[in-house]
Amino acid sequence: DWRSMAPISKHLKEVAISTNTRILAAAQINREGDNATWRPPQTKHLSQSDALGQDADVVITQKQYGQRAMVYSLEKNRHGSSGQLFFSRFFPNNGQFEEITKDEADLLRERYDDE
């Protein structure tokens, strides 16, 4: 449950501060966040991980945008602006991602989602 995540989140933040390093933590989203729209989930959709959203300096969520693209949302940025969306293309043959524009992502969606 969420109470078990709070001390973990706090410890991750303490380690990051004391070692002056960045830590990447992955969290599952709840069912409400896994909706049918194309937009990525929001911070409130972090499943049992409210503390991660509160303790984090940056929260980026992602969602599949068709078969070959991903859409990301900068949901929280403690040191700057947030709310930006950005897109990437996925290359399944080597597992790499490449940043692309929304127009390019839309074209990929049209091309590969018909297969």
Give residue ranges: language-model regions:
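C-terminal regions of RecA-like/P-loop NTPase motor modules
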Residues: W2, A6-N20, R31-E115
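H-loop/switch region of ABC-family ATPase nucleotide-binding domains
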Residues: A27
